[in-house]
Amino acid sequence: MRAIWLLAVLWLAGCQHVAVAPPPAGEILDLRNGQVLTAQQLLMRLAEPERVIVGEQHDNADHHSVQLWLLQALDEQRPQGSLLLEMLTPEQQSKVDQVRRAATPPADLPEALAWQDGWDWNLYGPIVRFALTQPYPLLAANLDTAEIHTFYRNPPVLKGERSNAAPVKSTLLEQISDSHCGLLTESQMPAMLAVQQQRDRRMAERLLAAPTPSLLLAGAWHARKDVGVPVHVLDLGAPEAPTVLMLAEQGSEMTAAMADYVWFTAVTPKQDYCEQMRKQFGK
């Protein structure tokens, strides 16, 4: 009983003021003019727009440390309106809301949220735990599994001039092929592209509907200004695209067409995802 009481105290304590730790290390650039920024200068710039997207490398722990710092530090600049996660689906939203309303935290938070195994809880857990103690909503931004299967089998017509531009589609097709290690057949590519763009469209819709100032955390390709969610935000009629901060490892190619700002972090050891994928494909 005492353990449960202590958990409740800690849970409620999260609703109070959080002392923001120093920012994680890294080199920050304004890609529009090449200016080197301090973390505080970046913070001031990100506090102004209504909508911000932060692109990540999913398995990079430094990126999630930066995201948590940004979430906490931005709230010091102005009240946060909402946080959206690519890692949450619509079918999880009611579970998220239920946990937020609870007087005490669940004994097993990932289980209570039906957290998907594909997203490493050790990396995302601190962000989710913090967000659940705050007054603003934590919102799902992705598609449900059933929707993905539907879009794969019957790709819908995507409306919008920018998202249908040939350079956008060709760039995404190349990325899809590379990320699947060249194991996809040509016949699979249109359906895979449709799913990717429907994910981007959903995130754009959710971002536009969310209370502002809003922050979306998503994979780098979803975040990109030239091919990802920002393109769909404009196709949906928004007067301006969201501001994009890309988190990237040192040495990564990053241009002003891709993002407004970049926060370079240390290079991490690469996992051989292609080897894992070849085993799944039996090749």
PLM ranges: what are they?
Residues 3-14:
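Bacterial N-terminal signal peptides
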Residues 15-283:
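Compositional signal for N-terminal targeting/processing segments
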